[in-house]
């Protein structure tokens, strides 16, 4: 039995956030889940398990944020030695193959978990109180879409290259079935269908309705919606997907809905200046963030100056930001010590020790944020001859830098990518922007990614042995 089928069989809710013996797994890895899915609490735990899978270092806990995708986006000038080939877009080596296999398997495993949950939800509305059934279902559909979309952005051609290109499977069932590969356009259509269904399920999400939720309401289950794929996170993700597709009209509609909601506030400089209690991830701007309880340990291993750390030369950092008044330049990097004193290390994810440090700042790794909505709006307006400067300058004004001018728009794509780089460094999104626009070169390398076909990562070789599958490149 091939690996892909095995993922579908054993990807059954393998982790849990707060319970060590959450599952009873027999030697054949079959989950005894009758009790788990007999109560609303069991479904809540299962959903937490899907989010927890995403926090692993092989996925968003490192590789799909500041790690592997950060390297592919040329975000760092100094990388651990086992990423040096990836930095050159050479994936024909053992370290890269292990990393790619981990990403592929991890994302499809999380999707299998989501599909299992959706299957178990069928016909069990009577188990749930209030709006929890539809909200949980909406989150799971959104998770399935989110995970698939990132698989496509890694292992599929961009929409700009060809909607008819063969990509990868879109898995919608929990079953030992090998799903067929989809064309890029069809795959994106399925992502959007899941997101549209998710948004409908989330119409009673408190973040949308404005309903106040406290600890006495179902133990506060619907509090802290920004660490769940909430209604506005779904709309933000839809804006991202529509933009990737080149559907600027719908991307603009979704981005404007998020911006107009008033639910997300720009970080205030006063919350950045005190290093012991700073809001380093700009938490008020999060549409969706993961809560990673081991984030401090991850930072210590990879972003704190050791041999396995990712870092930037000060000269490159200054080149990126241009202004020493930029909040991101001022507050989000720390200087290396000793022989590393020319290097700058990202401190966005640092876990501060002060007891006064706000709980809402802790353990947060953002995946969708407010500034992206303004960049999407600007790009959509660029294609419709609208006011491009206003949304770009809205971000500038909340980052402590001067407004851009009409003269800056002479090379719009280059400008936009430079603004993205300032904002999303360490977040795993920059590589995808260059791929989406099919730019030949990512600054920091002379490899012709578009011309040499390096933007599409080859799926694990073992998967190509599956009957009927062809190369995704």
Question: How would you describe each model-predicted region?
Answer:
Residues 34, 63-78, 157-164, 168, ...:
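Short, surface-exposed recognition loops and adjoining beta-strand edges that mediate ligand/DNA contacts
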